[in-house]
Amino acid sequence: NAYTTKEETLVYSVFPSGNMERAVELISDLVMNSVFPEKELEKEREVVLEEIHSYLDTPSEAIYDDFEDMIFSGNSLGHNILGTEECLSRMGTEECRRYLKSLYVPENMVLFAVGSIAEDKMFRLAERYFSPMHHTLVRNPRVPVTMSPVFSEVKSIDSHQAHTVVGVPTFGMHDNRKYALLLLNNMLGGPGMNSR
C-alpha cells in the first residue's frame, strides 16, 4: 500500500512478523525497480482523472485546494495533490522513471519498522535490500513559504450549499504550542458534534 501527501510518499506493508524479510524485499523492489509500463500508466491516469473530477464536483473538498492555492501562491504547497489534467497528460514512462530516480534515494528516505523484530536484523535487511540503490540525489531546495497578504475571495458555483474557510498563519509544527492549536482547531471546526 502507499499514500502521498504534499511533502511525502509512504510505501508500507502490514504482515506477520515472520515475513519481515519478504516485506522489506518487496518494498525495496517497488522503490528501486518500478518500470511504469505505458499501458498501466494510462489506466492509472484515468483513475486519477476521475478522482480529480469527483473532487472538483465536491465543493466541501475543493474549497480547501482553492484556499491553499491562494494562501501559498507560488509555492508547491498550494498545488492540488492530484495534479491537473494537463500535468497528467504529459506524464509518461520516462518522466516517472526520472522522478523516481532523482528523489527516491537513500538520502531522502526513512525505513521504519514496528513490531516483533530485532533492531540488528532490521539493519541487516535494510543493508541487503537498499544498499544497491543509486545515490544521485537531485537537490530540490525548499522554496520558502511566503503567505499571501490578507485576502477575501468569493467564488460562485451552482450549489445548494455555501462553504467558507478562514485561515490564519500560526507557528511551526515543532512548536510545543501546536497541541493547544490542535485542540482549538477541533473545537472550532472538528468533526460533527465536536465543533462549537
Residue ranges: model-predicted function:
Residues 185-188:
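Generic hydrophobic alpha-helical scaffold/packing signal
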Residues 1-138, 144, 154, 164-165, ...:
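Charge-rich, well-structured scaffold segments of protease-associated domains
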Residues 190-196:
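Short, intrinsically disordered, charge-balanced linker/junction segments flanking boundaries
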Residues 148-157:
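Short amphipathic
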